[in-house]
Amino acid sequence: MAKKKCGLLIKTAVAGIAAGAVYSVIGNILVENLLGKKSIKALIAQGGLMPSEESACFYTSDEALKGIEFYRKKVYEKLFTFNKHGECLHSIYYRNEGSHIYAISCHGFTGDPSQNNIYARRFYEMGYNVLLPYLRGHGKSEHYYCTMGWLDRLDIIDWINYIIEKDSEAKIILHGASMGAVTVMNATGESLPENVICCIEDCGFTSLWEQYSVQMKAMTKIPPEIILKTANPIIKSKLGFDINDNSPLEQVKKSKTPTLFIHGDKDSTVPFYMNYPLYQNAKCEKERLVVEGATHAAAGYVYPEIYWDAVTKFINKYI
């Protein structure tokens, strides 16, 4: 009987180790295939992660075409600065001579600064200087891994300081859509200079754990918590942070930066329900805009009048 029990324990242990090894492989695949620069390039070449019927407005709407034309014709500068680790950060910059107002607009996952040309055009025509940074793991970024807006928050603070060093009178607006929204929300949870006057976040998630859980439930029958718990040590090792750290929900609780929370009510990529907890838990001055009928990150493309009316009125309160 003792031998049978011992054998059963050994079999159970071996099965557990085998399962753990499988999940570890899955965790590695998750990190490399979702967050590695090589895979992100491949995703971009395939048209990104969103269904084509939802992403079409990014290329064919009137607002998109105006943004593309702006990007093609308007002269921009290529800027770079260094973070405290000596790593080079890259951005493109539209200069508005004589203006002391700056909009830092952050792109989404599988995007780059050109993805934000519709926002750049609008901010520029409002008379602002516009800085569009490359987020980690994307384009000219010298970081191999994407951190989904977490370590990027520190890069944004470096860009804020870069602007202030050049212009002590600077008034800075933070803006981002999707992962870019996560980036700017995460930044507002840190100690920011008074030069940062407000933040506009468009369809950011509550936490990386919750966002990945939502996506995995749609992709696999394996419980998301098993994959994420297995992937977390790999994320810690390769990216340098715990997946639970990336929580805009916790960051906005510490924020003192007035924030406009925007979300389309037909968003299934970053579910619409995530918007309200972010708004509700923010300790800063805040407003909320729900854009009816808008899918993920599409509000500014398909309902520009509603979008920019709210954004302009919000910014004008703090300039």
What kind of feature is each model-predicted range?
Residues 1-38, 57, 117, 122-126, ...:
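Short amphipathic, positively biased membrane-proximal segments
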Residues 12-82:
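An N-terminal hydrophobic leader/cap segment in hydrolases
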Residues 120-142:
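Conserved alpha/beta-hydrolase
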Residues 146-167:
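Alpha/beta-hydrolase active-site loop
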Residues 186-241, 250:
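Hydrolase active-site cap/lid region
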Residues 248, 257, 271-280:
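Short alpha-helix in the alpha/beta-hydrolase fold that links the catalytic acid
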Residues 254-256, 261-263, 267:
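Short beta-strand/loop motif that positions the catalytic acidic residue
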Residues 294, 302-319:
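Catalytic active-site module of serine/aspartate enzymes centered on a nucleophile-bearing elbow/loop
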